Amino acid sequence: MAEKLMKYSEAVKEFDPVIGLETHVELSTRTKLFCPAPISFGAEPNTELTPVSLGLPGSLPVLNATAVDYAIKLGLALHCQINEWSQFSRKNYFYPDMPRDYQISQYDKPTNGEGYLDVELEDGSVFRVPIERAHIEDDAGKNTHVGGADGRIEGADHSLVDYNRAGVPLIEIVTKPITGVGDRGPEIAGAYMRAIRDIVRALNISHARMEQGNMRADVNVSLRRSPDDPFGTRSETKNVNSFRGIERTVQYEIRRQAAILNDGGEILQETRHWDEASQATAGGRVKSDADDYRYFPDPDLVMLHITPEHIERLKAEMPEMPRERRNRLKAEWKFSDVEMRDVINADALDLIEETVKLGASPAGAKKWWLGELSREANAKGISLEELPINAQEVADVEKLIAEGKLNDKLAKQTVALVLKGEGTPAEIVEKHGFKVVSDDGMLQTAVDEAMAANPDVVEKLRSGNMKPMGAIIGAVMRATKGQADAKAVTKIVMEKIKG
């Protein structure tokens, strides 16, 4: 039975939403957090294991120093307080995906303390998200429930467990309650998650592919009548693995909770799950006020000491952060705020930057990646990076246009053939005999014929109405099989109507 929902615009007028996000980022180290087991996506189940990752008696953990450095770099990017001393604790719980029956995490002494992240919204404004902590922990294995209708344990015939993921290093970034969001809660949550993805990719510490589980989020939502009231009871939607899913989870929970509260009901403190098919959250486990995981310091791991000198060395290795990079490129490329937001929303910044480095103009690179190629990617349901064309090939097409060897129509045909796998732009131009007709005599003849066939258009042009010019250019293009230079044709037409 569908849950009752309040209209979103009414819900955010009646209530003050409060959001919290717990983001799990899988680090791209070669080996696991506490053992030398390799890490690779898509490996055969239960093949990347050691006694430590299986929690076998007598096995002892050894901390991965690279994972610690990655965590510190992320802490620096999030303006966190880097704690000189931090500690690993055992988080005790029993579930089939946790072979040793406890997770090694950081409890009261995390590596990264309080910080913040400024995120840009669609209108160009900036919203500051407060960070509570960003701590290191190891991941659990992965359960696959077989026989159920939706892949969940309810109704499943049996379950399979793959421990390859057990022990993979994670950073969990926990926000403080995000207040003051008004009606922009979904947008702020999505912008924050995209900013986290961009940062960890810039730092080269995670692939951050949500579809592969490299990055996922638990989304907490609560409502209160007024910003002066105490926080309401929150729901926690677990393991949401897409940006759109996060945005829709926030919106759905605001609408669901508002309807309950408006009818005089109470919100259950529970874990929920986002169902992509129904575009709704579904109820799960009802939680007590606080889960008792019986944390205690892991006796097999000494406290982690991070010296100021080590922090300074890592600071010196920090790359340019995504927001600063976007602002720099926007100025260099002379893009407007709207143009730059279009580039970012299309996830085309890296591709355009690489294309420009290879010789294309910023405007030309943007034209291709946000035009023909974006339409092609959207039609196929894939990302721009997955298209069978690269920055070098786009830059080569732009070069051929600049050299007068291709016009817009021939360039589009060339790109279409590159996408079909027929070769490089140069090979395609040679193979198909593409060339721009620049012979003045041929163009003069084609223009004369087009003007003779369109006397009404010529009359309008002579009276100063330039809108019908396209009819003459189109006729010349047809006569030359699309190989005429449109600028040259326009010049000839203008000379003839003035003469």
Swiss-Prot record:
One of its GO terms (biological process) is translation. SUPFAM superfamilies: GatB/YqeY motif (SSF89095), Glutamine synthetase/guanido kinase (SSF55931). It comes from the Bacteria. Disulfide bonds: none annotated. One of its GO terms (molecular function) is asparaginyl-tRNA synthase (glutamine-hydrolyzing) activity. Pfam families: GatB_N (PF02934), GatB_Yqey (PF02637). InterPro entries: Asn/Gln-tRNA_amidoTrfase_suB/E (IPR017959), Asn/Gln-tRNA_Trfase_suB/E_cat (IPR006075), Asn/Gln_amidotransferase (IPR018027), Asn/Gln_tRNA_amidoTrase-B-like (IPR003789), GatB (IPR004413), GatB_Yqey_C_2 (IPR023168), Gln-tRNA_amidoTrfase_suB_CS (IPR017958), Gln_synth/guanido_kin_cat_dom (IPR014746). SMART domains: GatB_Yqey. Keywords: ATP-binding, Ligase, Nucleotide-binding, Protein biosynthesis. NCBIfam families: gatB (TIGR00133), PRK05477.1-2 (NF004012), PRK05477.1-3 (NF004013), PRK05477.1-4 (NF004014). Heterotrimer of A, B and C subunits. Allows the formation of correctly charged Asn-tRNA(Asn) or Gln-tRNA(Gln) through the transamidation of misacylated Asp-tRNA(Asn) or Glu-tRNA(Gln) in organisms which lack either or both of asparaginyl-tRNA or glutaminyl-tRNA synthetases. The reaction takes place in the presence of glutamine and ATP through an activated phospho-Asp-tRNA(Asn) or phospho-Glu-tRNA(Gln). This is Aspartyl/glutamyl-tRNA(Asn/Gln) amidotransferase subunit B.
